[in-house]
C-alpha cells in the first residue's frame, strides 16, 4: 500500500542571510512544511508533493533511481533565494510507492492531486519516473471534469507506448484512454520530441490522437504553437521530463538526450504557460540522483521548479 510521509525538516536547510535585510530570505525560510496531508487548510497555495516511485522506469527497462529524486530536489531548492510566488509553496510530503504496486501508487497520487485541486490549491509534483504523469494528470481530469484540460509535455519521448501494463512510457496513452472513457477530448502537446528516440508506430499513434508535436530541432521557434495550444483549453497540466534537456545539462536521467532542448529554450517555452492563468498542475520527472555526481543536475532541475513557482499566475 502506498504510504504518505511528511518531508523531513532536515531537507529544508540553507544559508541564513536575514541579518542583511528582512527580505534576504531563501526558500528554506519561506516554504511551509506540513506535518499532515491537509490541503483543505491551504487554499490558494501551491502543494509541493513528492512521488517517490520508479517502478514504471524499471518496467520500461530504464535506469532506476528516480524514487530518490523528490528529496534530492528539495535539498537543491532549499538554498535558492525566495522571490515573489515562493511564499505560496506548502510542502505536503511524499507519496512512497512499494515495489511493485505502481497502479496503487498512481491511484494514491490521483486521489491526492484531485483533493488538492478541489480544495483550491495547485500542485507541483516532484517525481519519480514519468509514470508520475498518469496519476497526476488523472487527478487533474477528475478535478476539472466539466472543463477542457490541456496536457503539455516537454519530453524527448511521446510516451504513448502500448504495453500490457503501465510503465514510464505509457502515461499519455493511459490519459488518452481515460479521456475516451469519460467521453472528453484528449488535448495533448509534446515539445522537444526526438525523432531518433520514437518509433514510427509512436508517431502514427500521435498523429491518430491529433497530438501537437514539436521536434527538438524546432523548439527554438515554437512559441506560436505553444500559444495556440494554451488558447484552446480551459485548464493546463504541465509535465517536464528532464530528459528533454541535452545530456551536457542533464546527465542524471534514465535516458539522456544526445541533442535535447537547452534549458534557456525550455524556460522560454514554459513562461507563457505559467503566466496564462490556466496552469493548475505541474511536475518535474525522471531526475535520477544516482547519476548526479556533484549536485549540478539537481540544481538544473530545481531551477525549473523555482521558475515555475515564481511565474505561476
Swiss-Prot record:
EC nos: 3.5.3.8
Similarity comment text for this entry: Belongs to the arginase family.
Protein name stated in the entry: Formimidoylglutamase
Reaction equation(s) it catalyzes: N-formimidoyl-L-glutamate + H2O = formamide + L-glutamate
Keyword terms: Histidine metabolism, Hydrolase, Manganese, Metal-binding
Pathway assignment: Amino-acid degradation; L-histidine degradation into L-glutamate; L-glutamate from N-formimidoyl-L-glutamate (hydrolase route): step 1/1
Binding site for Mn(2+) 1: 130, 155, 159, 241
GO terms for MF: agmatinase activity; formimidoylglutamase activity; manganese ion binding
Protein task: Catalyzes the conversion of N-formimidoyl-L-glutamate to L-glutamate and formamide.
HAMAP family: Formimidoylglutam
Residues binding Mn(2+) 2: 155, 157, 241, 243
The gene coding this protein: hutG
Amino acid at each position: 500500500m502506498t504510504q504518505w510521509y511528511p518531508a523531513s525538516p532536515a531537507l529544508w536547510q540553507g544559508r541564513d542571510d536575514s541579518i542583511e535585510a528582512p527580505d534576504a530570505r531563501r526558500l528554506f525560510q519561506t516554504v511551509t512544511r506540513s506535518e499532515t496531508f491537509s490541503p483543505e487548510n491551504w487554499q490558494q497555495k501551491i502543494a509541493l508533493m513528492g512521488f517517490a516511485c520508479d517502478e514504471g522506469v524499471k518496467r520500461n527497462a530504464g535506469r532506476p533511481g528516480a524514487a530518490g529524486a523528490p528529496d534530492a530536489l528539495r535539498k537543491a531548492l532549499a538554498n535558492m533565494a525566495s522571490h515573489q510566488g515562493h511564499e505560496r509553496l506548502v510542502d505536503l510530503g511524499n507519496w512512497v510507492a512499494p515495489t511493485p504496486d505502481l497502479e496503487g501508487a498512481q491511484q494514491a497520487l490521483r486521489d491526492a492531486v484531485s483533493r488538492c485541486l478541489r480544495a483550491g490549491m495547485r500542485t507541483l509534483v516532484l517525481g519519480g519516473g514519468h509514470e508520475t504523469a498518469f496519476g497526476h494528470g488523472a487527478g487533474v481530469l477528475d478535478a476539472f471534469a466539466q472543463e477542457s484540460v490541456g496536457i503539455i509535455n516537454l519530453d524527448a519521448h511521446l510516451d504513448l507506448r502500448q504495453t500490457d501494463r503501465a510503465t514510464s512510457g505509457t502515461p499519455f496513452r493511459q490519459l488518452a484512454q481515460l479521456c475516451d472513457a469519460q467521453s472528453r477530448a484528449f488535448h495533448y502537446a509534446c515539445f522537444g520530441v526526438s525523432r531518433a528516440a520514437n518509433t514510427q508506430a509512436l508517431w502514427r499513434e500521435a498523429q491518430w490522437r491529433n497530438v501537437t508535436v514539436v521536434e527538438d530541432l524546432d523548439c527554438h521557434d515554437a512559441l506560436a504553437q505553444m500559444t495556440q495550444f494554451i488558447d484552446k483549453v480551459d485548464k493546463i497540466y504541465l509535465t517536464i521530463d528532464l530528459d528533454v534537456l541535452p545530456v551536457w545539462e542533464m546527465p542524471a536521467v534514465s535516458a539522456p538526450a544526445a541533442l535535447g532542448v537547452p534549458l534557456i529554450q525550455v524556460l522560454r517555452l514554459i513562461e507563457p504557460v505559467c503566466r496564462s492563468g490556466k496552469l493548475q498542475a505541474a511536475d518535474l520527472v525522471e531526475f535520477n540522483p544516482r547519476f548526479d555526481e556533484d549536485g549540478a543536475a539537481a540544481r538544473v532541475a530545481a531551477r525549473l521548479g523555482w521558475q515555475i513557482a515564481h511565474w505561476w499566475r
